[in-house]
């Protein structure tokens, strides 16, 4: 560190030595001579003293200057280059708190002055408007005065408005000058405020005055005089009334501050375009939203109710779900009828397990042999009969008992008043017996239990009571409400007691109907007859059905051309609880559809077409939704093998039963798809459908016509006829099993343990083994195991016993084994001989 004396420091700062010594003494330093040394700390102390004496304390600078210099090279034509230097300078000044407070106070004063000026301007405008209205009223009164006074001379009325007109220009000029001065002052204040805000980097304040967009003045009628507003505006502008006028008290359009919520009404189905229209958005927006949800749609796509509700709620709208049943409601209203109710016969459904004797019991009651006419001895249709007994008329419905006819039994329970549950005394309660009990309970129908085959050895009534009590059916003998009757359909034992129990239950139910009302009923069965067309079996539930009535049945309609009873005899009318077959419908209705007599054909056609379209839309919407739901589940999976079937049956109930049974077959690899089904014979269109879709033709109690047989023979289609439902199900199961292919299974034939290893010039390492399990065969695949771990898999090349080739070596014998392409055999290894067998897979 360089030594500096007081004298040298005085020369450096260009100050006299005496003055410097005096300042050092004032700073409290001990220097008194010019030759004394001054250290750096003493210099700092002196500098601080000098700054404080000049009222400039050691603090951060209030002004900062930033300089930036950048140099770049600019190339010009040829090899010349020019250096460009850009210099930027920026100065930041920190203001004191006093200046900031003064600035804020000045801004507040200016803002308050601007607001006062604007308020004064508004008050002046209001006063001016009131004056103008008063002046306009006075002018109008003066103009109307001459017309009102017919008697006096015109000259006498003229001087009256003169004072007002004379004073008008003076007051108008004064008001205009005052308003102009206030307007200029307000404009200067606003300009000054905006300049200050711009200097501070703030957003300009918005004046409380609402600026209104100038618009063209509407042309005035030719006969109207110049208004006072125009005169005053012209005077204020000083342009003689020329130019555009400002409209006062006009509000411009304001954007909505929040989202607009619409009330969206959604029926069972709705298209994308209709949904967008109700939400007041473009259809493309809805399509885009659904694409984001992972659902590709078009504007004409039909959406189901749940999907449309989800979209509308996600977009923030209120949803109201409605049912498109206005037409149905009007139809129901028109079918109401008031009349005298009378008692009617009970409708009794006979239910129970297959082969428990339901049809045989009915045969005895009807004195007819129905069971003998059914294929395979089992009932495959719903039979409807009405029987006149000594105690009154009873209508019976005979339902199938096989597992495939669950839907038929459910329909039978829904259309009935009483259920006779037939249970074989020697067989007990079976699965379909339990199902019949469940159907009866679901429909709220009372039960009468008929314990059949009571004459057979091994009949145990107490066992039946025990098993049914588990299902919730308790006999009257045990304190319940269900009568148990012992019967024998073969011998006729107990049939009278059974009918008495049924009629007793009917009296308790007090069954009534109105015979004078239009007929109403339910479809028990339907089929397509080759000569007569669609034939439907109807159970009339209320009113009277007559020949010639126009009927609506589900999505079908038509006029009743003919009516037949269960024996095939024509009848003219059918009352309550009477089953009949009707002809004249335009198609085969679904079993379970309700039939109603309507007033005219127009109404029937309208409702039928509405139901058809509604069913089609709902079906398409659900199919599309299901397809979209499964698109990600099936992605990456192998496609299922499908057995396509075209199925034709004699009646609609059998078609439903077969479709339900066949649809339940299959697994994750194979499935059954009924691509075409209908009632009636096999036609050319069915054969062409089977040809186009590579399907199998099944006919249940129907046959193919000549055209269909020709196509089947030419194209080699597979067509099969059946009359028992078991056979169809078994054949389809076999076909699906064949489509599954086979599995490869490994069978271990034998195991040999290596006792020693020899070397052979021909085969290499030869393992001397003892067969410890099974039999070892030559030319079979083997595995080499070491410590129970597979280390090699190959083929057995050489097998010898006592130097002779052997085809096989049994357990407990020694042999030499040569493993093909493997020489690393060690003592203690095990050689496992196996074979691969293909095994057929099952469902």
Swiss-Prot record:
Keyword field contains Secreted: no
Localisation: Cytoplasm
Residue intervals of the tr-type G domain: 343-516
G3 as annotated region, ranges: 398-401
Chief location: cytoplasm
Region of interest called G4, as start-end residue ranges on this chain: 452-455
Coiled coil: none
Compositional bias per record (Basic residues), positions renumbered to this chain: 237-250
Chain residue ranges for the region called G1: 352-359
Region annotation (Disordered) ranges: 50-72, 94-260
Protein name as it appears in the record: Translation initiation factor IF-2
Taxonomic placement: Bacteria, Pseudomonadati, Pseudomonadota, Gammaproteobacteria, Pseudomonadales
Molecular function terms from GO: GTP binding; GTPase activity; translation initiation factor activity
